[in-house]
Amino acid sequence: MLLFSRLIQQSKNPSGFLGKRMMKLWNRAYLPMFVWAIRYLDRTSYPAILDVGVGNGRSTILLKKTFPQSTITGIDISDTAIAQAKQIEMTNLNFERRDVRETGFSDESVDLITAFQTHFHWQDLEASFMELRRILKSDGMLLLACEYNKLSYFLPEVQSEEAFRRFLLSVGFELITSQRKGAWILYKIVKN
């Protein structure tokens, strides 16, 4: 049980050798989910993008390749993750250690917010979504994607689409659509 608890903690905030190894494993496991999810974005241009829970930044690189004209900031609470991500050098791509509950971004400054395989780890789901709503532009999009079974383990109270829809409405968001592919689910969310 101690090992399981340690692995759960590493998935929330990777650190040290184990955290670095897990991030490499996640790249293999979750980058295909990222590629699938971004196909559901409606626009071909998002000037300012925030990628939440970036790990070592590999998904953020794919975002930059998909939207080369965008300014993209990747955030994570893990010092280890951000140290690895900062090794990536691309124009208009930045990585910062920040908490999703208090990003420090200006009101309505982001066109697209993405979070892949991470929102079920946020310490305060309501505060996190309220912060994302604050920084998202009125015509912006929030795209979440994750393994569906993680929701039943970490967020059983909002696992059903209807419960998640109600939760989003309570924090000023609207669920536009959800899509499933095998074990994955994505949510397209806008301000209401």
Walk through the language-model features, giving the residues of each.
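Class I SAM-dependent methyltransferase Rossmann-like catalytic core
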Residues: 14-31
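Conserved alpha-helix/loop element of class I SAM-dependent methyltransferases that forms part
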Residues: 28-45
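Class I SAM-dependent methyltransferase SAM/SAH-binding core
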Residues: 48-52, 56-102
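A short acidic, Gly/Pro-enriched loop at the edge of an enzyme's catalytic core
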Residues: 101-113
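A short SAM/SAH-binding and catalytic strip from SAM-dependent methyltransferases
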Residues: 112-124
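A short glycine-rich, Lys/Arg-flanked "PGG" loop and its adjoining helix->strand segment in the class I
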Residues: 126-138
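Conserved beta-strand signature within the Rossmann-like core of class I S-adenosyl-L-methionine
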Residues: 140-147
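Core SAM-dependent methyltransferase catalytic element
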Residues: 180-192
